[in-house]
Amino acid sequence: AIALLLGMPLFVFFGALSDRIGRKRIMMAGCLIAALSYIPIYRAMQQVAGSQVVTAVSQRNATTGAISLTPQTMVNGALQPAKEVLPYSNFGSFIADPVAWKLILLVFIQVIFVTMVYGPIAAYLVEAFPAKIRYTALSLPYHIGNGVFGGLLPLIGLWIVAQTGNIYAGLYYPIIVASLTFIVGSLLLRETRHTLIWDEIK
């Protein structure tokens, strides 16, 4: 929540910056930087949080249906027995952890990527389509992108983690989507900064 509050002014900043240097350039840069940075950021978050687990896989007994946790593969390659989830009463100690600000910083960095895309995107979508089809042309791809690709992120990400046993594997989905957006957007999308939407009604 703190990282989101700190990042709110950046929506305005990148929106205003796109008026000067172009919307496409900022949005594509946000996608590219995010795709390249996700895994390093989440590795850093794992280390800051004090967890060295790389893989954790559970197995179900085919006869009894009981679930057992396999040893966890640590960063140094050692195997360690899986631990039980801490009771809720212990979570208070995490809130007062002195490294919390580092986690906030790492989340804030990701918020910057979001604002680089979402700051200019409203103006970009309005300028990209003529007035006669703007409502449908703007809302349909926007909501497909958010509803389908974004909405399925937890499901697909968790499925990838479950299939591979690697806690970072779920990041492959947003990385692939961001990379494809950068490639397709860089090659096919036009810059709209100089589009004057009011000229259509003159």
What is each of the regions a protein language model found here?
Residues A1-A16, G30, A34-Y42:
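Transmembrane alpha-helices of Major Facilitator/SLC transporters
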Residues I2-G7, Q110-V111, Y142, V177:
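Transmembrane alpha-helical segments of major facilitator superfamily
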Residues L4-V12, T115, G147-G151:
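Residue-level signature of mid-helix packing/kink "hotspots" within the transmembrane helices
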Residues R20-C31:
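Cytoplasmic membrane-interface "Motif A"-like loop-to-helix N-cap segments
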Residues Y38-V48, I176-K202:
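Multi-pass alpha-helical transporter architecture, strongest
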Residues Y42-L105:
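Low-complexity, proline/glycine-enriched hydrophobic segments characteristic of transmembrane helices
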Residues M116-F129:
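Intracellular juxtamembrane helix-capping segments at the cytosolic ends
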Residues V126, K132-T164:
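A late C-terminal transmembrane helix in Major Facilitator Superfamily
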